[in-house]
């Protein structure tokens, strides 16, 4: 995959080439438009180095400039206010002093052991991106080229990973016990559990397990929450009876998931919930939501390195909600 720059009319062409481009892995990330883009993959603490090649398009003309620089940028952009971006990382390397270009030039750059505290993310209302930015400073208008990188945040196995077990119900009508084998799952994991019916006095027609993603942006009263049902797993279709036990097995690998993100730079959060939904014969919906934590497992060869992520265990609140259908 070439690390190719863009064209700036007849003036020059800027190319950025990583030193390890041939061996470095790539990853995919969805754009705002929903298209998949492939970029080079980095982890926290890795250095970023390479060359900036500037190809002068018309060697008969001088390209005067006030300096050339490259930046490594980590940035959060809220789609509701694109004019107000927040940079949480900005490293600058000066490549050339003010002067002029009459022929092609190449400049080396290196950002040593760069801190990349968050995972790359594109959601419904927010984007967190990392990119290299080359700027040729000019009097009237700068020549700028940006190139995106993707960052993954790796984690070790959680020290504590308790199962989730609760009894919930509606008094004298429905009483069930459900259990999930863990509270924290890596992105390729399998959710294993079971549901046990202790009391059934309403006619249940359908039951499913949903994996729900909630993206929260903003602070306080200006917080916006975007909810997406990522996966649905049909547990049963028909009426259960007292004493019946139904197994659950939901494979996460086939879904587009990110790690759980909590209060990223005080701008946004991404959280995941398991939502148990029951529908009775009158189309009333009963549901119980339980938060889980998702994390990205380090590849086998990287697990000896000190990757670690703090986990916050969601606390269960044993209650079953009833949602009346619209009349």
From Swiss-Prot:
Record-level GO BP terms: intracellular protein transport; retrograde transport, endosome to Golgi
Name of this protein: Vacuolar protein sorting-associated protein 26A
Region (Disordered): 305-327
Pfam families the UniProt entry points to: Vps26 (PF03643)
Assembly, per entry: Component of the heterotrimeric retromer cargo-selective complex (CSC) which is believed to associate with variable sorting nexins to form functionally distinct retromer complex variants.
Topology with respect to the bilayer: Peripheral membrane protein
Role: Acts as a component of the retromer cargo-selective complex (CSC). The CSC is believed to be the core functional component of retromer or respective retromer complex variants acting to prevent missorting of selected transmembrane cargo proteins into the lysosomal degradation pathway. Retromer mediates retrograde transport of cargo proteins from endosomes to the trans-Golgi network (TGN).
Domain of life: Eukaryota
GO cellular component assignments: cytosol; early endosome; endosome; endosome membrane; retromer complex; vesicle
Claim: Kinase is one of the keywords in the record: no
Homology family: Belongs to the VPS26 family.
Main location: cytoplasm
InterPro entries per the UniProt record, alphabetical: Arrestin-like_C, Vps26-related
Cellular location(s): Cytoplasm; Endosome membrane; Early endosome
UniProt keyword list: Cytoplasm, Endosome, Membrane, Protein transport, Transport
